[in-house]
C-alpha cells in the first residue's frame, strides 16, 4: 500500500447518523436568525459540521467497550485510578485531576498559579502578564477574568500564509525573554505552551523550541503549563519534521515533550477522542502545593477530585482514548486528510495556511480583501459558506480575538482565518471534495460578500454568543 496516491480511511464505519439536506432559501433564513453567527445554528440545519473537532468525532470500539467497566463510586473510583495510570505511563505526570473539559482545568489552575506567584514572588496583580506561543480562546478568557493580561509571542512565519515553515507554532524565544524582562519576572504567573498552536492553523511546536522555552522559564522560576489538546498531532509532526526524532515512536516523543512543562491542561475532546472530558495534571512533588490547591477548587467547581465532573465510564473511555489517539497509522491518515483538503482548495485559488493537524485554515483576508478587519471577513466568509452549501466553519481572527479588556479597543489580529475543522473519523474524502466544490461557488461570488457589524456583543468570549448583521 506504500505506493498508492491516496489511502482510504483506516477504519470501518459501523454506525451512521443521517443528516438532512436543506435549500438555499432555508439556510439564508437560518443564518440570519442565528445573528450571522454559525455557533448559534441548530446542528440539524448543518450538512457538514466543521465548527470544531472537540468532542464531535467518532470513538474507537476499544473506547466504547471500556465504558462498560465504569465504576460510578463518588470517591475512590477504580476508573479514576485507571485514568491516572494512563497519564503516568504516557506523560510521566504523577498527579491527575479529571475535569469535564479543558476549560474546567483552566478555571482551576489559573487562579491557583496567580495566587502562588503573589504569595511567593510578590506579583503585582495590576501588572501581571502571562505568555504563550498563542493562547487558546478559553485560556485567554480565563486569564482575563482573573485580571491577567495575556501576550502571544510567536515567530514571524506563524501567520504568513505565503510561507512554508516546519514549526510555525514555535515560541519567539527572544520575544518571550524580552517580554518577561519588560513586565518583571515576578509579575508572570505562568507560561502556556499550546500544542499544536490552534490559532496559527494547527501548527506544531518543535521539541527544540519547547526545550529552549522551558530553559527560559526555569531561569526566571516561572511555571509552564502544556495546553495539550492536540499532543499526539504535535508528536506526529515532530517525528516527520525534526530529524533527531524520526525513529522515535509517538509514545516516546510524547514522553519527551512533557519533560518541558510543570503541569498539563487538556481538553481531551480532541486527540484523546472522547465526547466529553478534560485533565489537569501535575508532573511531580515540586508542584504538590499547586496540586493540593487545585484539588480543593475542583471539589467546588467540577466535582470530587476522583471524578471531576466525569462519570466512571467516561474516565475509562478517556484512559483508553489517550492511547488510541497516538496510533501512528491513524495520525498519518488524519494529517493526510487535512493536507488533501488544503491542496484541493489551493488548486482552485483559495489561499490557505500550510496544512496543520486538525483543520484547513482559509486566508479570508486574501479571499475578501474588500472587507476590513473590523467587519470580520472570516466571519462573513463562514456565513457565505453556510448559505452556499450548509457547511458550518468557524472564524479564527479579529472576531474571536476580541477587545483589549482595559481599553475596549479591538485587538489587532495577525491574520483573518476561517477554520475548517475536521472531526475525527467522521467525514470521508467525498466530503472533502464537496467542501472544495463549495468554495468554487463561494469564490465566484466573493466580491459581493458583505462585512458584518454587531447587534449584540458580550464582553468575554464574544464569538460564542454574539449576534451580527450585514453592513
Swiss-Prot record:
Is Acetylation a UniProt keyword of this protein? yes
Needs which cofactor? pyridoxal 5'-phosphate
Residues annotated as carrying N6-(pyridoxal phosphate)lysine in the record are 270
Q: Does the keyword GTP-binding apply?
A: no
One Pfam annotation, family name? Beta_elim_lyase
Q: Which UniProt keywords apply?
A: Acetylation, Lyase, Pyridoxal phosphate, Tryptophan catabolism
Q: Which GO terms describe its molecular function?
A: tryptophanase activity
Q: What pathway does this protein act in?
A: Amino-acid degradation; L-tryptophan degradation via pyruvate pathway; indole and pyruvate from L-tryptophan: step 1/1
What EC class is this?
lyase
Enzyme Commission numbers on file: 4.1.99.1
Which reaction does this enzyme catalyse, per its entry? L-tryptophan + H2O = indole + pyruvate + NH4(+)
The PTM N6-acetyllysine maps to: 5, 115, 156, 450
Q: How does it assemble?
A: Homotetramer.
> What family is this protein classified in?
Belongs to the beta-eliminating lyase family.
> HAMAP family recorded for this chain?
Tryptophanase
Q: Which NCBIfam families match?
A: PRK13238.1, tnaA_trp_ase
How is this protein named in the record?
Answer: Tryptophanase
Protein's organism: Escherichia coli (strain SMS-3-5 / SECEC)
Amino acid at each position: 500500500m506504500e505506493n498508492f496516491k491516496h489511502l482510504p480511511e483506516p477504519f470501518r464505519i459501523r454506525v451512521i447518523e443521517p443528516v438532512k439536506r436543506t435549500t438555499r432559501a432555508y439556510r439564508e433564513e437560518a443564518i440570519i436568525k442565528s445573528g450571522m453567527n454559525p455557533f448559534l445554528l441548530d446542528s440539524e440545519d448543518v450538512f457538514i459540521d466543521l465548527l470544531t473537532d472537540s468532542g464531535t468525532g467518532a470513538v474507537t470500539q476499544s473506547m466504547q467497550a471500556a465504558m462498560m467497566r465504569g465504576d460510578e463510586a463518588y470517591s475512590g473510583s477504580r476508573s479514576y485510578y485507571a485514568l491516572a495510570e494512563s497519564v503516568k505511563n504516557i506523560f510521566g505526570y504523577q498527579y491527575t485531576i479529571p475535569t469535564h473539559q479543558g476549560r474546567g482545568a483552566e478555571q482551576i489552575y489559573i487562579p491557583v498559579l496567580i495566587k502562588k506567584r503573589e504569595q511567593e514572588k510578590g506579583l503585582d496583580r495590576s501588572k501581571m502578564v502571562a505568555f504563550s506561543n498563542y493562547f487558546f480562546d478559553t485560556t485567554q478568557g480565563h486569564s482575563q477574568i482573573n485580571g491577567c493580561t495575556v501576550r502571544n509571542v510567536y515567530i514571524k512565519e506563524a501567520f504568513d500564509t505565503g510561507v512554508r515553515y516546519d514549526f510555525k507554532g514555535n515560541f519567539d524565544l527572544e520575544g518571550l525573554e524580552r517580554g518577561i524582562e519588560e513586565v518583571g519576572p515576578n509579575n508572570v504567573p505562568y507560561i502556556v505552551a499550546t500544542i499544536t498552536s490552534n490559532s496559527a492553523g494547527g501548527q506544531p511546536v518543535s521539541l527544540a523550541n519547547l526545550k529552549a522555552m522551558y530553559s527560559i522559564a526555569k531561569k526566571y522560576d516561572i511555571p509552564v503549563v502544556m495546553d495539550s489538546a492536540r499532543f499526539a498531532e504535535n508528536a506526529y509532526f515532530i517525528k516527520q519534521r525534526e530529524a533527531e526524532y524520526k525513529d522515535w515512536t509517538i509514545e516516546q516523543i510524547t514522553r519527551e515533550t512533557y519533560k518541558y512543562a510543570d503541569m498539563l491542561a487538556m481538553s481531551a475532546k480532541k486527540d484523546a477522542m472522547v465526547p466529553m472530558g478534560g485533565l489537569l495534571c501535575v508532573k511531580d512533588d515540586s508542584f504538590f502545593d499547586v496540586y493540593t490547591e487545585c484539588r480543593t477548587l475542583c471539589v467546588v467547581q467540577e466535582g470530587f477530585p476522583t471524578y471531576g465532573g466525569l462519570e466512571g465510564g467516561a474516565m475509562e473511555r478517556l484512559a483508553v482514548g489517550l492511547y488510541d489517539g497516538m496510533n501512528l497509522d491513524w495520525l498519518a491518515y488524519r494529517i493526510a486528510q487535512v493536507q488533501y483538503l488544503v491542496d484541493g482548495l489551493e488548486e482552485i485559488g483559495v489561499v490557505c495556511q500550510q496544512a496543520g493537524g486538525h483543520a484547513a485554515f482559509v486566508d479570508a483576508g486574501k479571499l475578501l480583501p474588500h472587507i476590513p478587519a473590523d467587519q470580520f471577513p472570516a466571519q462573513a466568509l463562514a456565513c457565505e459558506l453556510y448559505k452556499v452549501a450548509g457547511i458550518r466553519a468557524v472564524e479564527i481572527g479579529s472576531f474571536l480575538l476580541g477587545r483589549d479588556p482595559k481599553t475596549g479597543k479591538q485587538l489587532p489580529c495577525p491574520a483573518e482565518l476561517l477554520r475548517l475543522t475536521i472531526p475525527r473519523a467522521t467525514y470521508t474524502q467525498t466530503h472533502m471534495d464537496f467542501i472544495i466544490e463549495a468554495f468554487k461557488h463561494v469564490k465566484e461570488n466573493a466580491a459581493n460578500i458583505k462585512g458584518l457589524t454587531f447587534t449584540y456583543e458580550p464582553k468575554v468570549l464574544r464569538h460564542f454568543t454574539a449576534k451580527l448583521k450585514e453592513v
